Amino acid sequence: MKRIAIIGECMIELNGAPFRTMQQAYGGDSLNTAIYMARTAGQSIEIDYVSALGVDTISEGMISRWKLEGINTDYVLRDPTRQPGLYLIQLDEQGERTFLYWRNQSAARYLLQHPGFPNVEHHLANVDMVYLSGISLAILPPTDRQKLINLLHNIKAKGVEIAFDSNYRPALWDTKLEAQACYKQILTLTDLALVTDDDEECLWGDSSQQDTLHRLRNHGVRNVILKQGAKGCLYTDFTTDIPELIATTPIDTVIDTTSAGDSFNAGFLAGYLTNKTPREAALQGHQLAGIVIQHKGAIVPRSATESINFNKEIK
């Protein structure tokens, strides 16, 4: 059985008008991927979520729900002095979303300073793959960010594959140059890059897919998935000059794209780690994302994703 460790932060989500009725949930890019991957892979892959929460009742409830999804929470550290981060989603009259965040003192931000983190370090050296995103890095204090990159360098030398989703969020970085410097370091360690054309344009000013692929190749990335929204994605391992376009099936009714990229990553990684071809893995990601975007919220009901049979051959 393959084993993947997913590093990141899950936050409490409030959705609604201030001082009126609000819906309470939780979400975060890495956690979304972990959940959808657990649903996709079943018992064929062990999925470890690596993060930190408090010892409060909300933290307890979150962990209980993750266990029900089939995620191993042994490496979610508990911080008695901090709690989960919080974000509020507000909708305007046109249905556009705006976000307010309270995360600077979250337990996950100080994950690497937790006294239990050396045990996590030891564990990460013994998994098959570590997956993280630009958000996983952005939330950390700069010294901890560098410590994590150094750790990834050490475990890569021991044979652990590194998968990275760029997931660039400008508001989480002091400057664009700071983000670029960090991404350059992580990309030199990356075996599998899962990037999005919009993010690459925003961070690097890429004007074409060739710009993106050329830059990633120069950083030494071995495998690249370039997500292109409704068009599908491109895959290359740089053994040929032309990347493979893997189209997705158009969705007539799109309700919420919050977890489109996260769920695609989950489906792709589940296929990748169970020895499916890149095309098969990407089609699996497209199928899963296509279901997710037809429902509201970052984490859709299990009944929705159970409608996909990932054990049959994908044509």
Regions found by a protein language model. Give the residues of each.
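Positively charged, low-complexity intrinsically disordered leader regions
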Residues: 1-17
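Substrate-binding N-lobe of the ribokinase-like
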Residues: 18-96, 104-108, 314
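Short, conserved phosphate/pyrophosphate- and ester-handling motifs at nucleotide-, phospho-/glycolipid
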Residues: 37, 196, 261
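Conserved phosphate-binding/catalytic loop of the ribokinase/pfkB sugar-kinase fold
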Residues: 90-142
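Conserved phosphate-binding/catalytic region of the ribokinase-like
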Residues: 2, 205, 209-315
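Structural alpha-helical scaffold elements that stabilize or flank donor/cofactor-binding regions
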Residues: 122-123, 185-186, 217
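Conserved beta-alpha-beta core of the PfkB/ribokinase-like small-molecule kinase fold
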Residues: 129, 135-214, 232
